[in-house]
Design a protein with these regions (language model features):
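Hydrophobic alpha-helical transmembrane segments of multi-pass membrane transport proteins
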Residues: 40-43, 183-263, 441, 581-664
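Extracytoplasmic/periplasmic domains immediately adjacent to an N-terminal transmembrane anchor
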Residues: 2-193, 395-592, 801, 814, ...
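Hydrophobic alpha-helical segments typical of transmembrane helices
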Residues: 69-73, 213, 225, 349, ...
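Loop-to-transmembrane-helix entry motif
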Residues: 20, 24-31, 243-249, 282, ...
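Ser/Thr/Pro-rich, intrinsically disordered low-complexity segments
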Residues: 822-829
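Membrane-spanning alpha-helical segments of multipass transporters and channels
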Residues: 45, 66, 97, 250, ...
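Alpha-helical membrane-protein architecture signal
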Residues: 10, 14-18, 194, 233-234, ...
Length: 830
């Protein structure tokens, strides 16, 4: 009997699987979200970072000395692989303007009489400035300037000592009695593709898995086929859900395994662990993500609402995975909430295997938690069945809407219709409330700590001396670092690192103090994990600062080892002072750099969603014989486009004031731009986004499908904008793609205006408005051709070489070009 029941259950499971496979192959949407988008995501993350190195970053040099020494410094800067000297300035103001315009990312100032002051030891100074509103670039430039100019700083004393017959090694030991040897583990080149490609592929992938799972189940209830689905499963909800999701699980698992082979194979991301174990954890992660989607949908199975919630959950997972900003540095409620996301546990397990070659014993808790998501979904399935039966009963007594004639078209009627459609649609109101207000507040709150503080470090002190204890005490006192514990065993410290308890290891050798006492250079070793670049950056900065303090305190003790002429060299010369200034992000915080870009993406993404959802609803209404608006002439088309654009524009003016005006004040995000300039920038951005959305929305045949496509790209917009990684270092095809979407250029433009303090007057000299090109929207109905036009391809603020002369002419040409392109657009609408 049991065998017979099992046979019936397996037969029902096979029937549900075949039914779902037929549904998947009957709509191009499923091919796109199950195959095309994941493969595109894999290609995107595998190629977006180019060679992964921050090299050839454009910088400038302001040489006000014009001597042999200053030219030698310029050659030294040009020879550094991080820099690409694109321009030599004769005025610091010109260099600052170039930095504001993003022609360069930093510049070095060599002041007048530098050589004379360096030779005479009268306070020679070198100052460098770097664009810290772009954190990744700013950090690289700061480190490169410090490393390149370090020999220059000591050169006056070294040259004077060598001229008096003292060896360079002897004077170098006196100047730097303690030196650091820093070893970034696993990723010694600090390659961004190694750091970000693997985790962010799965971050994007989990958004797609969540949305596809909810849509596949929710579409059964939406299109009235839930009864047939449950009946085919013989009334067993477990069979119904398992059969429906199994085809997606197999496809997503195949793509996840393929991604592992691509990332650790052709992309050459180092991986010494078990690929079989990594693939097994990947499949478990995919199933756990599907289980989370089932759980969320079962709580309240209204696809119009829940798919919006799930899109926000998926996007929040990108932040709470802890890849870029460590979750441990966030507020306690955010840290606790991160464990509600499967991607967080998968990231912990994957990084343990990738970075530390850890075995299963080190991340079994993460694997166990992924199984808990599956258990939670199984326990809530009876509730989902109850909802389905309730929906079937309501369908039986509900009356289908009767067709109604389209309303007379006028601009005022289009505006009234659009306002009414937005105000009476709970799903769209949820997107606006959640995407604009909740999302904006949450992102600011999550990144409110802004800086990574007290990164734990293990100390292996084999010296047990007064000097080593002083160094440890000073290191623990820095804001970036906290001493987790001390151990005499380096292997125990490595165990702490594998377990994720510490982010680095400080190794003080047995002769740490003895070498200083003998007049020799003493070296301490810092081993730092690179699974979070911000942790590594904090450890590196804190150890370097403590090293400088210790050197200053103990340098005079080394005078007994110098010959008289060495003392004369030290007394008669002085080192060059090297100072750096971070511009446009005075807090040097991660949130201060990322949040402005995220706010622009929120505006762009939610507007696309709202317009596409409304257009999808109209497509659903047309299939039911309800035609709300019909364009029979060019004038009608212009009324529809103009009326709709007016509604979206006015709505998002208010939202922009909240996101770009109120939130920066509430969360102390640096901003020095003019409100008028930002308004001027937002006008073409909002218009361009509206036109783009009207053009692409015709491809969506229901109101939920847009969220599958649009929400998926939320993280990609940030990368493509050039804020996280310099646009100049990306492959040419991604540089071109940057201009296809208004969000990319608008992100850069907003940062230039708001954080760099430029004005639109100077921006127009560099900005070329391509205008608005026409796009034709054709309805798919066989009995009617809808000639309403979607205007797309926002004149993408193409950045061209700066025009520093004839600024007023440039502004006039910019406006004339914009007007001409608008007239051309109107002529093309046919």
């Amino acid at each position: 009997m049991k065998d017979k029941e099992f046979g019936y259950a397996m037969k029902a499971l096979r029937m549900v699987i075949r039914r779902e496979w037929h549904r998947m192959t009957s709509r191009r949407l499923y091919l796109g979200v199950c195959v095309v988008l994941p493969l595109l995501c894999l290609f995107f993350m595998a190629t977006i970072f180019g060679n992964g190195q921050m090299e050839n970053i454009p910088v400038g040099i302001v040489d006000l000395d014009n001597t042999a020494t200053s030219r030698n410094i310029s050659r030294r800067i040009s020879a550094a692989p991080t820099f690409r000297v694109t321009e030599h300035f004769t005025d610091e103001a010109d260099a600052r303007r170039a930095l504001q315009q993003k022609d360069i990312y930093g510049y070095l100032v060599i002041p007048p009489r530098f050589e004379q002051k360096a030779v005479t030891g009268t306070g020679a100074t070198l100052t460098y400035y770097y664009h810290y509103a772009l954190l990744s670039v700013g950090s690289e430039l700061m480190a490169a300037f410090e490393n390149t100019l370090a020999p220059v700083a000591l050169s006056p004393i070294v040259m004077q000592a060598e001229a008096l017959g003292v060896s360079g090694e002897q004077i170098q030991t006196f100047l730097l009695p303690v030196e650091a040897s820093t070893h970034p583990l696993y990723n010694p080149d600090m390659d961004y593709s190694i750091y970000l490609s693997q985790p962010f592929f799965f971050v994007l992938f989990q958004i797609l898995i969540l949305l596809t799972t909810v849509y596949s189940i929710g579409s059964e209830l939406k299109f009235g086929s839930a009864g047939e689905w449950l009946e085919m499963a013989r009334g067993n909800i477990l069979t119904a859900v398992a059969g429906k999701l199994l085809p997606y699980t197999l496809i997503f698992s195949s793509i996840g395994i393929l991604a592992n082979y691509v990332l650790f194979g052709p992309l050459h991301i180092p991986f010494a662990g078990s690929l079989w174990l990594m693939n097994a954890v990947t499949v478990l992660f995919i199933i756990a993500t599907q289980a989370l989607a089932v759980f969320i949908y079962s709580v309240f199975p209204k696809i119009a609402y829940i798919i919006s919630v799930v899109s926000m959950v998926g996007s929040l997972g990108a932040t709470l995975s802890g890849v870029t900003f460590p979750v441990t540095a966030m507020y306690a409620p955010v840290h606790a909430a991160s464990y509600l996301f499967p991607v967080r546990h998968f990231t912990e397990a994957a990084q343990a295997m990738i970075y530390f070659d850890a075995g299963f014993a080190y991340f079994w808790q993460s694997v166990a938690t992924l199984f808990i998501f599956l258990l939670a979904a199984l326990l809530i399935l009876p509730l989902l069945k109850w909802w389905i039966k309730k929906e079937i009963r309501e369908e039986a007594i509900s009356a289908s809407p009767s067709p109604c004639p389209p309303t007379a078209l006028s601009t005022a009627s289009v505006i009234r219709h659009e306002w009414h459609a937005i105000a009476t649609n709970p799903a769209i109101l949820l997107v606006l409330a959640g995407g604009i207000f909740l999302y904006g507040l949450l992102y600011n709150y999550m990144y409110a700590p802004n800086l990574v503080r007290k990164a734990p470090v293990a100390v292996v002190d084999l010296s047990h001396s007064a000097l080593s204890r002083e160094y440890i005490r000073l290191l623990d006192a820095t804001p970036q670092t906290a001493v987790y514990g001390q151990t005499p065993n380096i292997l125990e410290a490595r165990q702490w690192m594998k377990q994720g308890d510490v982010a680095g290891i400080l190794y003080l050798p047995a002769d740490f103090e003895a070498r200083v006492a003998r007049g020799e250079t003493s070296v301490f070793v810092l081993y730092a994990a690179t699974d979070a670049f911000l942790n590594f950056k904090g450890l590196q900065e804190s150890s370097a600062r403590v090293m400088l303090v210790v050197n200053d305190a103990h340098r005079m003790e080394g005078t007994v080892f110098l010959p008289p002429q060495g003392l004369l060299a030290v007394a008669s010369s002085a080192p060059v002072s090297v100072s750096g200034t971070a511009l446009y992000n005075y807090t040097e915080g991660y949130g201060s750099y990322l949040i402005p870009a995220v706010l622009i993406v929120i505006i762009f993404q939610t507007m696309l969603m709202v317009i596409a959802m409304l257009t999808g609803e109209e497509a659903e209404a047309r299939r039911k014989g309800i035609r709300l608006m019909r364009a029979d002439s060019l004038k009608d088309t212009l009324r529809i486009v103009g009326g709709r654009t007016f509604v979206y524009f006015m709505l998002y003016v208010v939202f922009s004031l909240f996101l770009l005006g109120l939130l920066p004040h509430l969360f102390s995000i640096p901003h020095i731009g003019s409100g008028g300039d930002i308004v001027t920038m937002m006008i073409p951005f909002l218009l361009g986004t509206s036109f783009l959305a009207l053009a692409v929305s015709r491809w969506f045949t229901d109101s939920e499908a847009p969220l599958l496509m649009i929400a998926f790209f939320s993280v990609g917009y940030i990368f493509l904008s050039g804020v996280s990684y310099p646009l100049e270092l990306m492959p040419w095809y991604w540089q071109a793609a940057h201009y296809l979407f208004p969000a990319g250029p608008a992100d850069v433009f907003f940062i230039v205006l708001d954080l760099s303090g430029r004005s639109c007057r100077t921006c127009f000299c560099k900005t070329e408005f391509n205008g608005w090109n026409a796009g034709r929207r054709m309805a798919a109905d066989a009995d009617d051709v809808d000639t309403s036009i979607g205007l797309w391809n926002f004149g993408a603020l193409h950045y061209t070489p700066p025009l520093r002369k004839r600024k007023s002419e440039g502004i006039k040409k910019g406006y004339l070009s914009q007007t001409a392109n608008l007239l051309l657009t109107l002529n093309l609408i046919l």
